Amino acid sequence: MIEVALRLGLDKPAESRRVVLRQGEFGNMRLRLVVCEGGMAKDVSLYDAALCVAGLCVEVPCNIADGVVFLTVPKGLTAKAGKGRAYVRLSQVSDGTADDADTVQTDVITTQTFELEVLEGVQP
């Protein structure tokens, strides 16, 4: 399994990263996405995570282990060639406040973006 590790900031620094995949390949690469805040790794264990890719119109649920976001590249992510800007969306549902116990609040934060490119697959 090939692992690609990225550090993605919540403060959205200007520097950009790039991940290149091949059309039709899936299950053989894992993205390890460390979410940082103020330059320090943030424990995201209490969040739900999804990789969102604008341009490719893809949203993929991710796993979280030891406070780090992991995604084994699924078939849907490499179904077609193209480029997009990707980011991790973290969401956390919390119960209502003391004033309104019936409400449910969802807090959402996003990381900086990175370029995700899916190259054309090799044709037989």
Region roles according to the model:
Residues 1-123:
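N-terminal assembly/attachment segments of tailed bacteriophage virion structural proteins
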